[in-house]
Amino acid sequence: MDQLAHHFSEHIVELNRRVAEIIAREKLSGLVIHSGQHHRQFLDDMNYPFKVNPQFKAWVPVIDNPNCWLIVNGRDKPTLVFYRPVDFWHKVSDVPDAFWTEHVDIKLLTKADRVAEFLPKDITNWAYLGEHLDVADVLGFTSRNPDAVMNYLHYHRASKTQYELECMRQANKIAVKGHQAAKNAFYNGGSEFEIQQQYLSSVGQTVNEVPYGNIVALNQNAAILHYTALEHTKPAQRLSFLLDAGANFHGYASDITRTYAFEKNSFCDLISALNAVELAIIDRIKPGVKYTDLHIETHHHIAQLLLDFNLATGDAAGLVDQGITNVFFPHGLGHMLGLQVHDMGGYLHDERGTHIPAPEAHPYLRCTRTLEANQVLTIEPGLYIIDSLLDELKQDSRKQQINWDQVAHFRPFGGIRIEDNVIVHQDRNENMTREFGLID
């Protein structure tokens, strides 16, 4: 924790530097950042689970308390207006006293609608950052989520501070424990629901605390890219298991995927081959490399796997050029990772918001930036048997290059995805996921 405290001091200095630069450029007095508010369920008296504004948790690891505010101007100590109502219905958050509190000026707010008393007297030249524009209107903000400010913050968010990197290491360390427990639950005969419970118990987080809905997929369910159904019934035959699950630490996410075969067979060999592809692509990561180039290179590796495992015929370059690899690997290679699972800034060329579009042939790629030191990325190649995409392919001449008997052989296994979280350093890569022990 001492190391976190040391890094947090530097983190706040860097965030203040960024704010000072952008508000000077945009002639603003400062930023007022709203943690967010509860959303009430329609025709009900219950709220949806609260999700904090990522711009807010960049400054303080307060991720579960609505109606909080930050007042920052890049010069003075940030002011945290911390919501602490008098409430006998709900648990009221304790006044923070952790390592980071010495770096902010904490003021307590007991009634959410009295926040104006804590804001600058004249907010004409202050920008509101947050989701609730109706609240911003009531408070009198005329500058709300200005594009120039948001683009600047999102662009620079890709460059992680040492504090952020340490938080993400801890998020990986926690998630690795969950993955190991889930793997054991799979081999011990657990259902998807039971495996999920083992994972959550091991990471010590609820379904609303982990950074995204876990994908716990047995057998053919692994072909559904964002499968979250969680069947309670155990399958009659246990073939494969895909787990895409992360953990949260101080508001920072990990995002890890592994795939397992229940028995030693050709699907197990395919997993090993894709694992080798993933590691080869990670070895290619270094500052100056375009993420788009890594994605396209991965498609050539996938093409070779299709040939090696007799799923397709022809040559690797042709399979890529004809879009056949897109049928088996339809998503992007990965994305930026941080305060959000799909962290902001992945398409930005510069701090003014110049957009770098994904290649026309690869529209689902979530990152098109040139890599730099201190960025954190996921690398997650996949290979799936997705019937809806294969049905489209059957409509044209490309169907002749597919070995449909081999497709049928692999269909019950669903698919494979392998995903690690990687820090780009100037002279090396740091594969956090593997370094914490999730080797396979």
UniProtKB/Swiss-Prot annotation:
> Matching SUPFAM superfamilies, A to Z?
Creatinase/aminopeptidase (SSF55920)
GO BP of this protein: proteolysis
* Gene name for this UniProt entry: pepQ
Cross-referenced Pfam families, in alphabetical order? PepQ_N (PF21216), Peptidase_M24 (PF00557)
Q: Name the InterPro entries for this protein.
A: Creatin/AminoP/Spt16_N (IPR029149), Creatinase/aminopeptidase-like (IPR036005), PepQ_N (IPR048819), Pept_M24 (IPR000994), Peptidase_M24B_aminopep-P_CS (IPR001131), X-Pro_dipept-like (IPR052433), X_Pro_dipept (IPR022846)
Q: Show the GO MF annotations.
A: aminopeptidase activity; metal ion binding; metalloexopeptidase activity; phosphoric triester hydrolase activity; proline dipeptidase activity
Q: Where does Mn(2+) 1 bind?
A: D255, H335, E380, E419
Entry EC no(s): 3.4.13.9
Q: Name one GO cellular component term.
A: cytosol
Q: What's the protein name?
A: Xaa-Pro dipeptidase
The protein's job, in short, is: Splits dipeptides with a prolyl residue in the C-terminal position.
Q: Which reaction does it catalyse?
A: Xaa-L-Pro dipeptide + H2O = an L-alpha-amino acid + L-proline
Source organism of this protein record: Shewanella denitrificans (strain OS217 / ATCC BAA-1090 / DSM 15013)
Per UniProt, which keywords does this protein have?
A: Dipeptidase, Hydrolase, Manganese, Metal-binding, Metalloprotease, Protease
For this chain, the family text in UniProt reads: Belongs to the peptidase M24B family. Bacterial-type prolidase subfamily.
Per UniProt, the cofactor note for this protein states: Binds 2 manganese ions per subunit.
